[in-house]
C-alpha cells in the first residue's frame, strides 16, 4: 500500500486531482451512493432545473460495467500518461497556465455537450489533452500496440479508431480532438507561427493562486520551455525535435 501511496503522491498536482476524481466519481455511482442519473449532463436538468453540478460530474463520471470497463481503464491510463507529460513537460513550473488550458477545453466541451446532447464528457476532455501533447511533440516517433510506429501527431486519430473498436464513440473522441486543436491553434499556431494576436490569456487570479515556480514570462502566446529549447537547438527553424519516442504502456 505504501508503494501505491508513493506512486499517487508522485503524480503532479493537477493531474493527481483530476485522476482521483475520475476514479472516485464512477466508484460513487457504481456503489449507488449517488444515483448515476444525477451525474450525467442533461441539458434540460442543467438549464431549467438549475442542477449546476452536472457539467462537473459528467466530466469525471463514466458508467463502468462489463462492457465498458476496459474502455474506462484505457482512457484512465491516457489521462495519467499524457496529462502528466504535459504538466511536467511543456507546462513544467506553470500550473496556472496548465489549469487554464484544462478550463478552456472543459468549457468548450461543456458548450458542445449541451448543444449536441452529450451526456458524458470524460473522454472528450482526456482526448483534448492528448491532442495538445501530440501537437507539441508532433515529430516524435511513438510506438503503439503490436509494434506499430508513427509520428505523435497521428496518435489522437489512431486512438480515436482504437477507442471505437473497443466500444467507444467516434463523436466523443472527435470532439476532444477538435477542442484540443482549437486550443493549440489559438495558443501556439496562430500567434507564434502565423503572427496573429493572442486570443487567450491566463487570468491573473490563477497566477496568484498557482504562481509559476520558475523565472520567465508566463501566459499564452509564449512557447513552453520545451518548445523554446527545441527551437534554440534547431536554430529557430520550423521543424522541432522534442525528444525520443516511448512505447505506449511504458512508465
Curated annotation (Swiss-Prot):
Q: Which GO terms describe its cellular component?
A: Derlin-1 retrotranslocation complex; Derlin-1-VIMP complex; early endosome; endoplasmic reticulum; endoplasmic reticulum membrane; endoplasmic reticulum quality control compartment; late endosome; membrane
Residues passing through the membrane, by range: 16-31, 70-89, 95-115, 123-137, 155-166, 171-189
GO terms classed as biological process: cellular response to misfolded protein; endoplasmic reticulum unfolded protein response; ERAD pathway; establishment of protein localization; positive regulation of protein ubiquitination; proteasome-mediated ubiquitin-dependent protein catabolic process; protein destabilization; response to unfolded protein
Q: Where in the cell is it found?
A: Endoplasmic reticulum membrane
Look up what happens after changing residue 180 to V. Answer: Reduces interaction with and proteolysis of XBP1 isoform 1
Q: Where is this motif: SHP-box?
A: 241-248
Tissues expressing this chain: Ubiquitous.
* Residues that bear Phosphothreonine: 202
Annotated signal sequence is none
Q: Which residues carry this modification: Phosphoserine?
A: 201, 226
Q: Which residues lie on this side of the membrane: Lumenal?
A: 32-69, 116-122, 167-170
**A Pfam family name for this chain?**
DER1
How would you describe this protein's topology in the membrane? Multi-pass membrane protein
Mutation: residue 165 to A; reported impact is: Impaired ERAD substrate degradation
Annotated region Disordered: the residues are 229-251
The UniProt keyword set, sorted, is: Acetylation, Endoplasmic reticulum, Host-virus interaction, Membrane, Phosphoprotein, Protein transport, Transmembrane, Transmembrane helix, Transport, Unfolded protein response
InterPro entries annotated for this entry?
Answer: DER1 (IPR007599), Rhomboid-like_sf (IPR035952)
Which residues are reported to carry the modification N-acetylserine? 2
Give residue ranges on the Cytoplasmic side: 2-15, 90-94, 138-154, 190-251
- An MF annotation (GO) of this entry: identical protein binding
The job of this chain, per UniProt, is described as:
Functional component of endoplasmic reticulum-associated degradation (ERAD) for misfolded lumenal proteins. Forms homotetramers which encircle a large channel traversing the endoplasmic reticulum (ER) membrane. This allows the retrotranslocation of misfolded proteins from the ER into the cytosol where they are ubiquitinated and degraded by the proteasome. The channel has a lateral gate within the membrane which provides direct access to membrane proteins with no need to reenter the ER lumen first. May mediate the interaction between VCP and the misfolded protein. (Microbial infection) In case of infection by cytomegaloviruses, it plays a central role in the export from the ER and subsequent degradation of MHC class I heavy chains via its interaction with US11 viral protein, which recognizes and associates with MHC class I heavy chains. Also participates in the degradation process of misfolded cytomegalovirus US2 protein.
> How does it associate, per the subunit comment?
Homotetramer. The four subunits of the tetramer are arranged in a twofold symmetry. Forms heterooligomers with DERL2 and DERL3; binding to DERL3 is poorer than that between DERL2 and DERL3. Interacts (via SHP-box motif) with VCP. Interacts with AMFR, SELENOS, SEL1L, SELENOK and SYVN1, as well as with SEL1L-SYVN1 and VCP-SELENOS protein complexes; this interaction is weaker than that observed between DERL2 and these complexes. Interacts with NGLY1 and YOD1. Does not bind to EDEM1. Interacts with DNAJB9. Interacts with RNF103. Interacts with HM13.
By sequence similarity, the record places it as follows: Belongs to the derlin family.
Question: What name is this protein filed under?
Answer: Derlin-1
Amino acid at each position: 500500500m505504501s508503494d501505491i501511496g508513493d506512486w499517487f503522491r508522485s503524480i503532479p498536482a493537477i493531474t493527481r486531482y483530476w485522476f482521483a476524481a475520475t476514479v472516485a466519481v464512477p466508484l460513487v455511482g457504481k456503489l449507488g451512493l449517488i444515483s448515476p442519473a444525477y451525474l450525467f449532463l442533461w441539458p434540460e436538468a442543467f438549464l431549467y432545473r438549475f442542477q449546476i453540478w452536472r457539467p462537473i460530474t459528467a466530466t469525471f463520471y463514466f458508467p463502468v460495467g462489463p462492457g465498458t470497463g476496459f474502455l474506462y481503464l484505457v482512457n484512465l491510463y491516457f489521462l495519467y500518461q499524457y496529462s502528466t507529460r504535459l504538466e511536467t513537460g511543456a507546462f513544467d513550473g506553470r500550473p496556472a497556465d496548465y489549469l487554464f488550458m484544462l478550463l478552456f477545453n472543459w468549457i468548450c466541451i461543456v458548450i458542445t455537450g449541451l448543444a449536441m446532447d452529450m451526456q458524458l464528457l470524460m473522454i472528450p476532455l482526456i482526448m483534448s489533452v492528448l491532442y495538445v501533447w501530440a501537437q507539441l511533440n508532433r515529430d516524435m516517433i511513438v510506438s503503439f500496440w503490436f509494434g506499430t510506429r508513427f509520428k505523435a501527431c497521428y496518435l489522437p486519430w489512431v486512438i480515436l479508431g482504437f477507442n471505437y473498436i473497443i466500444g467507444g464513440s467516434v463523436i466523443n473522441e472527435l470532439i476532444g480532438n477538435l477542442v484540443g486543436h482549437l486550443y493549440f491553434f489559438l495558443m501556439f499556431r496562430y500567434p507564434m507561427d502565423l503572427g496573429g494576436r493572442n486570443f487567450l490569456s491566463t487570468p491573473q487570479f490563477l497566477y496568484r493562486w498557482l504562481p509559476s515556480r520558475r523565472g520567465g514570462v508566463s501566459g499564452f502566446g509564449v512557447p513552453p520551455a520545451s518548445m523554446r529549447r527545441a527551437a534554440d537547438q534547431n536554430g529557430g527553424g520550423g521543424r522541432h525535435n522534442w525528444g525520443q519516442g516511448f512505447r505506449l504502456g511504458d512508465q
